[in-house]
Design a protein with these regions (language model features):
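Thioredoxin-like thiol-disulfide oxidoreductase module
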Residues: 1-19
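Short amphipathic alpha-helical segments embedded in low-complexity Lys/Glu-rich regions
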Residues: 2-4, 25-27, 143-144
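Alpha-helical interaction elements in eukaryotic regulators
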Residues: 7, 33-36, 229, 266
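Structural micro-motif
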Residues: 15-25, 34-35
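Non-catalytic, surface beta->alpha helical segment in thiol-disulfide oxidoreductase systems
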Residues: 26-46
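Non-heme di-metal
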Residues: 47-372
Length: 372
């Protein structure tokens, strides 16, 4: 066995023309073995600039996928003033929403604004300073700005329903909520390995930690309740799905440029991040349902859905599934979100967001598969 580089070099000197397999090619140029690639990796990354290097010029693009995602994201731009919440106020104050449902919605809204604050701060503090390539930085900046819109939209909903300002820090009184925020914000990007793990966690933050709340709020849409709130959720889902797509691609590009960080321990840490995210969601779901169930959605269904969506996120990162939930346990989500207009649930299926030309359906939230 050729167990080390010295033995391999000695073998190749004795056997001219011998090559190990597989042989690596980049743009039809023969690089050689994995060891040969590692010897020239830094040179190759430096030649194209790399994710962590300032772009010398606007073009040529080295990460055109980031430009494409940014363009699509900006075409989906919206602001909180576009949302009509008048019917929500009538639902809330006119008896259409029960006391159990009010407590349920309030618990979700207590955390939602702060969750988007955490996500936005992560972009500004963890990622924008590190990723200096212009295409990627523009993508991250676009994502960060949209989180500000999410914050204002959910804050507007709180205020329109008459919830006091004290609700903005009420989440601190509940470990089920405070622990989620701690998880979302705790990262160490001081090393390449830590930066890679932080990118993976960002996919869990936006693609898992927010989605239980999305489902719990969007359920009211099915019964003609809180339709303005439902619109905010629909547009947020479109945004977060694009963010997850972009951050997953960034994670894989970063790992490709720094392959030495990707080992068994690195992958195991990501699986543990995913499992911990699910545990936190289970606790939060139990809190939301503490006063009882709501029409059309059981706590157990939300928990199963979170396992389903977590497996989809692992696939987007290029990893294997963990919970083995292959089918969406809430098929009504696809029906609700793939409609053409947001009018009355009983007359029309709910939304296809078309502001600035965005089209597409719920399945796009899961469409980015693994890379072998």
């Amino acid at each position: 066995m050729l167990d080390n580089e010295e033995q391999r070099l000695e073998f190749y000197q004795k056997v001219p023309g011998a090559r190990s397999v597989p042989q690596i090619y980049i743009d039809d140029k023969h690089i050689g073995t994995y060891d040969d690639l590692m010897r020239v990796a830094d040179t190759l990354v430096k030649k194209i600039g790399g994710l962590l290097e300032f772009s010398e010029t606007y073009k040529p693009f080295h990460y055109p996928w980031a430009v494409d995602i940014t363009t699509r994201h900006e075409k989906a731009h919206w602001i909180e003033d576009e949302i009509d919440l008048s019917e929500d106020v009538t639902d809330w104050k006119g008896g259409k929403i029960t006391e159990v449902e009010k407590d349920y919605i309030t618990n979700v809204l207590r955390l939602f604004t702060q969750s988007d604050v955490a996500v936005g701060q992560n972009y500004y503090d963890q990622f924008v300073p590190k990723f200096k390539n212009n295409e990627v930085r523009n993508m991250l900046g676009s994502f960060a700005a949209r989180e500000g819109i999410h914050q204002r939209a959910y804050a507007l909903l709180n205020e329109t329903l008459g919830l006091p300002d004290s609700e903005y820090h009420a989440f601190l009184e509940y470990s089920e909520m405070a622990d989620k925020i701690d998880y979302m914000m705790k990262s160490d990007t001081s090393t390449m390995r830590g930066l890679g793990l932080s990118l993976a966690k960002s996919v869990m933050n936006e693609g898992v930690a927010l989605f239980a709340s999305f489902v719990m709020l969007l359920n009211f849409q099915r019964f003609g309740k809180m339709k303005g709130m439902g619109k905010v959720v629909e547009w947020s889902i479109r945004d977060e799905s694009i963010h997850v797509e972009g951050n997953s691609k960034l994670f894989k590009a970063f790992c490709a440029e720094h392959p030495r960080i990707v080992d068994a321990d690195f992958k195991q840490d990501i699986y543990e991040l995913a499992r911990h995210a699910v545990k936190l969601e289970d606790k939060f779901i139990d809190l939301a349902y503490k006063m009882g169930t709501v029409e059309g959605l059981e706590a157990a269904e939300v928990k199963q859905y979170i396992r389903y969506i977590t497996d989809r996120r692992l696939l987007q990162l290029g990893l294997r599934t963990n919970f083995k939930v292959k089918e969406n346990p809430l098929p009504w989500l696809e029906w609700v979100l793939n409609g053409a207009d947001h009018t009355n649930f009983f007359e029309n299926r709910v939304t296809e967001y078309e502001v600035a030309g965005l089209t597409g359906g719920w399945e796009e939230a899961y469409s980015q598969g693994a890379v072998s």
